[in-house]
Amino acid sequence: MPKRELWPAGSCSEPVTHIGSCGSMMSTTSTHSGSSDSSYDFLSAEEKECLLFLEKTIGSLEAEADSGLSTDESEPATSPQSFRALPTTTQRAPQGKPEARDTQQVPVPVPKRAAQSSGPPESPSPGLRSGSYSLPRNLHLGRSQNLRKSATQTNSVSEAPEVFLEEPKKGQTRQGAKTIQPPAPSQEGTPDLNTVLIPPPEAFQDITSKKAEGESPPKKPGEQTHRPQGHILERSPHSQKKADMSSETMTHKATEKGWTEGPQRPQQPPTQPSQNTQAEEPSLPSGVKPNIQQSLLTATKPRRLPPNIVLKSSRSSFHSHPQNWLSNHTEATDSGPVSSLQEQRKARREALEKLGLPQDQDDPSLPVNKHTGSFKVKEAQAQTSSQARAPAQPASPALVRGTASVAEKASSVKAITPLDSLSKGWIPAQETPPGKVGAAKSMPIPIPKASKENSSLTQSKPDPRLTLQESSIPGLRQMNFKSNTLERSGVGLSSYLSAAEKDPGGQTSTSLGKSPFLDKVSSSVFRNSRPRPASLGMGKDFAGIQGGKLVGLEQGQCSQQPSFKGQSHDKLPRPPCVSVKISPKGIPDGHRREALKKLGLLKE
C-alpha cells in the first residue's frame, strides 16, 4: 500500500499509546505506575476476559521461548504498556484504544524482549524521531511512520514485527515528551490506523504469528488497558532473562548484518533498544526457521508411516517397494514366518503348475531340496537384510532403499522358475527380527542367527548360493519346454527323472533330444511306471493280435511316417504311432484300418 501522507512527519504526531513489546514492562510499570489503574476504565467485561486469557497464554509462550521458538511472533505487539501511557491525557486513552486494536492486527507481538529496552527507552525520543523517517532498518520509528511502513511492509511478516517492536520504545520516549504530542494528530491518526493496518497475507504469515493474530484481536484492547502492573512485573523477569539471552546472540547477528542505526546512535540509550529490536529482527527469521524445520520434521514422520500401511498389502509389494519390507520388517512379519512357509509352498505349487511339472515330486523331495535351497536363499537375504537393518532403522530411508535395491537384485537373480516364488515367500521371514525368525519358523534350521554371526560374510556368500541353486536349475531348465509335452502326454516328471538316472547318456542322441527322450518315455516309463487303466485292458490282450500283422504294419507306418509328414520329428515332438498301439481287444482289423486312414497314418 502507498504510504499515507496524511500523517505529519514529526514524531509529535505519534500518540503516547504506542508503547509496544520493545518497551520493557518494567519501565512501563515504573513510569506509568500511577496511570495503569486508570486504563481499566476503558475495559469492558469481554476485554477483561481477554486480559485473563492473555495472562494464561503467557506461560505457554514463555515455554515456547525456552524451547527455542521465537517468542517474537507469539505475543501481541502492543502490550498494556501502551495504555499505561494513555492516562497522561484523557483524550489519548480512547484514542489509544482503537489504535491499539488496529495495531494488534499485525501478527508480530514481542513483549518478552521489552525488558531489554526497559531502562533507556524514554530518553531517546529525539533520536527516535530523527530515525523514524528511514526504512525499518532504523529500528526506532514513530507509530505513524511505522504504520506507513507497515502498510508497505505487510507483504512480509518479519518487517511488520520490526515496525511494531520499534514503536513501543517511541511511546516510552514520548512519555517524557507527552506535552509535545498533541492529542489531535493522534485522533487524525486513528482513522488512518484503521485503514492502514492490514495483516500480511496468509502466505507470508508464520504459524505462530497466525496464532498470535487469533489471540490478539480480542485480547489486545483489553490487554493494553487491562494488564495490571503486577502482571507486568510477573512477566518482566522472564522477559528480561530471555531478552538478555536473545539480545546477546541477536546483537551479534545484527552487528554482523550491519544494521544501520543511523541517527539513533547519538544517544547510547536509544542504541541499546535498537540493538534489542535488531536482535528481534534477526530473531524473526530465526524464529521462522525453527517453524520451517519443525514442519519438515513433522513432514518426514508421515513419510515413514506410509510404508507401515503398504506393508499389509500384497506380497508382490516387496519388489515394488523393497524399502517397506526392510524398514518395517518387524511390524509386518510377526505373523509372517508361520504363514510364509504356507505361502511359499503355495507359490511353489503354482510355479510348478505353470511349468507343467507334477506336484508329486514336490512333496517328498522339495522339503529336502527346495526347503534347503530356500533356506540358503533366505540365509543370504537375511544376512543382507541384517546388514540393512543396522543402518536402515536409525538411518534415512535412502539407506533402506539402497539395501533394498541390493536385496532386490539378489532376489531377481534367484527368481528363476519356482525360485521367484521362493524368494517372495521367504522375504517376510528373513526380515523378521532374527530372534523371532528362529522361534517362529516351523523349519528347524537356525539361519537367522547365522545371519547375525556371519553378517561380515554376507556379500561373499550370496554368490555361491546363487550358483548352487542355478546349478540345480539347469536340469529343470532343460526340462522346461519338455514339460509342456510331458503335461500333454501325461508323463510324470518323477518317472522321467528315474529313467534319466538309469540311462543318462541317451538324451543327447538327436539334435533336439526330443524323440529319443519320448521314445524312452513311451517304452520304459509310460508302460512300467504308471499303473495301467482298467479300461484299456491288460497288456496280455495286445500280445497276439492278428498274428503280429499289426506290429509289422505299425513298424512300416513308423518308417513311412517321416517321409509322409516330412519334418515331423522337427516340428512334432510326440513319438510316432504311440496312439496306434493302444487298441482294445475286440475291434476287428477293418475298423482299425479305416481309422488309421482317416487319421492319415495308413497309406495304401
From Swiss-Prot:
Entry keyword annotation includes NADP: no
Keywords: Cytoplasm, Phosphoprotein, Receptor
Gene that this polypeptide is encoded by: Sarg
Domain of life assignment: Eukaryota
Provenance organism: Rattus norvegicus (Rat)
Cited function: Putative androgen-specific receptor.
Sequence segments annotated as region (Disordered): 20-41, 64-411, 424-484, 497-541, 553-592
Compartments where located: Cytoplasm
One Gene Ontology term, aspect cellular component: cytoplasm
Lineage: Eukaryota, Metazoa, Chordata, Craniata, Vertebrata
Ranges annotated as biased composition (Polar residues): 68-93, 143-158, 311-330, 556-566
Main location, first listed in the record: cytoplasm
Alphabetical list of InterPro entries matching this protein: SARG
Identification of the protein by name: Specifically androgen-regulated gene protein
